[in-house]
């Protein structure tokens, strides 16, 4: 059995599924660490500190942000979020930033509210699909 993603990805995916949200790991052909059908991409960061810098994280941090920005511009219905596990214990969510500026613990949203929003959207989508059938 091969590993798919980091520990933080696995933990978040489990939390989403337990919350009743359909979600799956991303793949090379589908960008993002976690995909929530039909149009949500979640990118996960797991810094040891209480902030995450796209520039100092690695050479790919800013390039990855740019690639996701281009994808979002090409497909405006895509919703992209960052979920960060700060200092390996405190989870926060962020809307996709307009610039690759640092993400800070005190500026992030709580996961419960984020999960509620995602579940309501999926529930509404399922009701809409049932009506169409």
Segments predicted by a language model, with ranges:
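Acidic-basic catalytic patches of nuclease active cores, encompassing PD-(D/E)XK
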Residues: 1-25, 30
């Amino acid at each position: 059995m091969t590993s798919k993603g980091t520990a933080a990805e696995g933990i978040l995916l489990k939390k989403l599924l337990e919350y009743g949200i359909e979600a799956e790991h991303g793949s090379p052909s589908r960008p993002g660490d976690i995909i929530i059908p039909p149009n949500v991409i979640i990118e996960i960061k797991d810094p040891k500190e209480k902030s995450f810098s796209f520039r100092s994280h690695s050479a790919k941090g800013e390039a990855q942000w740019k690639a996701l920005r281009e994808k979002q511009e090409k497909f405006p219905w895509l919703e992209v979020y960052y979920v960060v596990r700060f200092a390996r214990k405190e989870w926060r969510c962020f809307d996709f930033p307009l610039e690759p500026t640092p993400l800070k613990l005190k500026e992030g949203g709580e996961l419960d509210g984020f999960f509620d929003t995602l579940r309501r959207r999926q529930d509404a989508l399922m009701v809409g699909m049932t009506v169409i059938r």
